[in-house]
Amino acid sequence: MAAAPGARLLRAACASVPFRGLDRCRLLVCGTGAGTAISPWTPSPRLHAEAGPGRPLSVSARARSSSEDKITVHFKNRDGETLTTKGKIGDSLLDVVIENNLDIDGFGACEGTLACSTCHLIFEDHIYEKLDAITDEENDMLDLAFGLTDRSRLGCQVCLTKAMDNMTVRVPEAVADVRQSVDMSKNS
């Protein structure tokens, strides 16, 4: 089976970064559809690797964005305020929050490594039913989240599609960071 574009580069990049344990090198594959295994050998329109906190590695050149490549996303924060921004098709909702510097305290504390549930979001019914299937790892983290609903997902695991244009996602009033057992309530 042929390797995905950039897979060889990904393996080399992860191997060349000094850190303890290869388990800290993760691969986020967006836009591949439900049931896709996350692996450097999976063909994907977008590959992004990370080697530990604060060590992003680009393994493929991102296409230049045009206004057609972006959609509008509305985040309803803990105070009920709606934050409206644009996000690139294929980016995760965590990427959107970070790249647009949205004021959502504590959101994505683990930087998308599935080690916390601080990017917990609640989706509208018509959007939730179109999302890719949830993985066991994401489900395990969601079990630890405050305010869990039947429409809850982690923002680091949901990638934008055109069908999500103008969606509204709600940030729960309280968040649990399982790494520190910290409650960041509405006051944050």
From Swiss-Prot:
Electron transport among keywords: yes
Record-given protein name: Adrenodoxin, mitochondrial
Organism: Mus musculus (Mouse)
Subunit structure: Interacts with CYP11A1.
Residues annotated with Phosphoserine modification: 67, 181
UniProt record similarity statement: Belongs to the adrenodoxin/putidaredoxin family.
Cofactor comment: Binds 1 [2Fe-2S] cluster.
Entry's Gene Ontology cellular component terms: mitochondrial matrix; mitochondrion
Gene: Fdx1
Matches recorded under InterPro entries: 2Fe-2S_ferredoxin-like_sf (IPR036010), 2Fe-2S_ferredoxin-type (IPR001041), Adrenodoxin-like (IPR001055), Adrenodoxin_Fe-S_BS (IPR018298), Beta-grasp_dom_sf (IPR012675)
Superkingdom field: Eukaryota
Modified residues (N6-succinyllysine): 70, 162
